[in-house]
Amino acid sequence: MGKDTIADIITSIRNADMNRKGTVRIGSTNITESIVKILLREGFIENVRKHRENNQYFLILTLRHRRNKKESYKTILNLKRISRPGLRIYSNSQRIPRILGGIGIVILSTSRGIMTDREARLKRVGGEILCYIW
């Protein structure tokens, strides 16, 4: 049985957000780094640091905060894994779904790398739908 690294990072971020943790530590691979870059660029996370411990690299993510009058609280971050090792989901560029009318993003793995739904539509490429984030 294989390990699903994308589901692991989605679960880690979701659990940290629900437990009101400020930071998340995930293992660093090429796939996780490209997904984290997209999350940082789209504003879902605040900061990313690369940390080395015992010849292993980790990414330390700082989650974004919202301010309230009484106290600061975390944003409610919704992440959902779509394509998984047992059931791969593919889409062409015309049929890439829109999440909440364009408010959320879809992360795709294409022949040109991992990108958001907007970038894939502009480049007119389809691919495997990895996850939804809203």
From Swiss-Prot:
Q: Gene3D superfamilies, from UniProt?
A: 3.30.1370.30, 3.30.1490.10
What name goes with this protein? Small ribosomal subunit protein uS8c
Q: Which GO terms describe its biological process?
A: translation
The UniProt entry lists the main location of this chain as plastid
The record's subunit annotation is:
Part of the 30S ribosomal subunit.
- Superkingdom, natural source: Eukaryota
Protein family: Belongs to the universal ribosomal protein uS8 family.
The organism is Aethionema cordifolium
Checking PROSITE patterns in the record gives:
RIBOSOMAL_S8
Task: Give this protein's Gene Ontology molecular function annotations.
Answer: rRNA binding; structural constituent of ribosome
Functional note: One of the primary rRNA binding proteins, it binds directly to 16S rRNA central domain where it helps coordinate assembly of the platform of the 30S subunit.
**Keywords annotated in UniProt:** Chloroplast, Plastid, Ribonucleoprotein, Ribosomal protein, RNA-binding, rRNA-binding
Q: Does the keyword Chloroplast apply?
A: yes
Any idea where this protein resides? Plastid, Chloroplast
A cellular-component GO term for this protein: chloroplast
